[in-house]
């Protein structure tokens, strides 16, 4: 038999279509430098090579960045590490989630695989709950010029890595911010994105969410333009900050709680037509105001998360939803965070009982009623705390009394959570009447 332990798995398909701990706020941010061939060989990267190359760094506040050589955008490509983009996102993260926290960062070449994610989770002892991936790899590909839509491969690759980590009891939610401005092809990359060809990213990938959009301001435009790859700066830092500050059951798109106007005075997509015009500026980065409701609804229906505005809220910028690339039970980041929290807590509570004696009923050979009650109480106590803190609506714990633990040395415990709902849509019917009755 394999090595003993407590092994967790979850089920999908059961539903259809705020207490906090330090661990649920632990966050990771991976910068994929595979498109920066000389990142650690020249300029700012060379200056910090010994500190950053191959290392996972824990940052607890903005004060830690100076020593690491991570500085704000200045316009000097010799001094700005990755064009100031890392500082921009880390600053957003701590600005939103609080001045102190736990953020693990890494700069790694992920052109061949995403093993850096596993390395980061190991360095954090499995405690990273949400991980942002900023990459210059193209989000969309055009393998067939005659195809009606682009293809999307990054989501599948990241889902596979996250699923593997979940099997190792280190589950996390991945937020992907990739190069949406340049379409990868078999030959020369295409710098013009056709909105009608954007594919759905809902491909049964519950651990991954795809982010689009960025701030519309001079520094963001300058950072994108300074990068030869023209990769959008994105909004990954703000998204991670919102998630880290939210309770596990809360959507980071909650309008009343996560207004980002202080970080994004105006917004754009960051893609469209990034060929240079006669003024050496990007031709079009699709201002949010230039997109109509049909186009925005289409992006939402295809599973993307983007910065948005609501009519009537003049001073407001928000994330559109907290959806994942799945339409199953775990179709939101909040639901994944909730089940991940329960998994970690239940597993930690049960680990002391691995290889412990299990008293059986001598008349049946099955698990004794006392032991069944004991294990039910262990799990129920944890889930009751979550319910009292309104992180879940309810739960059930089941232990089959007819388990033959003498035969297989295995105890099977099942629990189900009733999640907290979310008001993604509020529909109101209005009209006139002759009376108020």
Predicted regions located by residue number:
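Small-residue-rich
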Residues: 1-206
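Short, ordered beta-strand-loop transition motifs
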Residues: 21-22, 211-216, 402-409
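Residues that form generic nucleotide/phosphate-binding pockets
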Residues: 68, 93, 345, 349, ...
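Alpha-helical structural motif
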Residues: 85-86, 338, 375, 411
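Compositionally biased, low-complexity/repeat regions
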Residues: 103, 108, 392-437
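Long, hydrophobic alpha/beta structural blocks
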Residues: 170-253, 258-264
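Long, contiguous, structured domain-core segments that constitute the functional module of a protein
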Residues: 244-371, 414-437
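C-terminal structured domain segments
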Residues: 360, 364-416
């Amino acid at each position: 038999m394999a090595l003993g332990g407590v092994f967790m798995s979850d089920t999908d398909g059961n539903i259809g279509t705020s207490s906090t701990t330090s661990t649920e706020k632990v966050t990771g941010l991976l910068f994929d430098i595979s498109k920066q061939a000389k990142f650690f060989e020249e300029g700012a990267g060379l200056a910090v090579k010994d500190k950053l190359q191959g290392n996972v760094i824990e940052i607890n506040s903005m004060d830690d960045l100076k020593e690491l050589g991570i500085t704000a955008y200045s316009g000097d490509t010799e001094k700005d590490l990755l064009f100031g983009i890392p500082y921009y996102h880390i600053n957003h993260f701590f600005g939103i989630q609080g001045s102190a926290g736990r953020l693990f960062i890494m700069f790694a070449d992920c052109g061949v695989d995403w093993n850096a994610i596993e390395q980061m989770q190991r360095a954090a002892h499995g405690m990273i709950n949400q991980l942002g991936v900023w990459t210059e790899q193209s989000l969309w590909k055009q393998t067939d010029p005659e195809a009606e839509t682009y293809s999307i491969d990054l989501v599948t690759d990241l889902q596979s890595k996250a699923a593997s980590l979940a099997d190792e009891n280190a589950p996390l939610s991945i937020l992907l911010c990739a190069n949406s401005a340049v379409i990868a092809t078999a030959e020369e990359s295409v710098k013009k994105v056709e909105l009608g060809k954007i594919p759905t990213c809902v491909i049964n990938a519950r651990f991954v969410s795809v982010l689009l959009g960025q701030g519309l301001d001079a520094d963001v435009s300058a950072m994108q333009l300074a990068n030869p790859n023209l990769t959008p700066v994105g909004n990954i830092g703000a998204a991670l900050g919102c998630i880290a500050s939210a309770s596990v059951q809360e959507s980071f798109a909650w309008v009343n709680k996560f207004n980002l106007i202080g970080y994004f005075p105006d917004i754009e997509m960051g893609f469209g037509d990034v060929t240079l015009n006669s003024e050496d500026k990007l031709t079009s980065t699709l201002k949010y105001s230039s997109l109509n409701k049909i186009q925005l609804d289409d992006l939402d229906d295809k599973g993307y998360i983007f910065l948005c505005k609501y009519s009537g809220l003049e001073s407001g910028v928000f994330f559109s939803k907290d959806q994942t690339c799945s339409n199953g039970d775990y179709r939101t980041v909040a639901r994944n965070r909730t089940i991940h929290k329960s998994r970690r807590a239940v597993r930690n509570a049960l680990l002391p009982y691995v290889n412990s004696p299990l008293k059986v009923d001598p008349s049946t050979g099955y698990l004794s009623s006392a032991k069944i009650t004991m294990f039910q109480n262990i799990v129920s106590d944890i889930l009751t705390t979550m319910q009292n803190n309104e992180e879940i609506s309810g739960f059930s714990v089941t232990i089959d009394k007819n388990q033959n633990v003498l035969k297989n040395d295995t105890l099977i415990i099942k629990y189900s959570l009733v999640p907290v709902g979310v008001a993604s849509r509020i529909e109101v019917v209005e009209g006139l009447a002759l009376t108020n009755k």
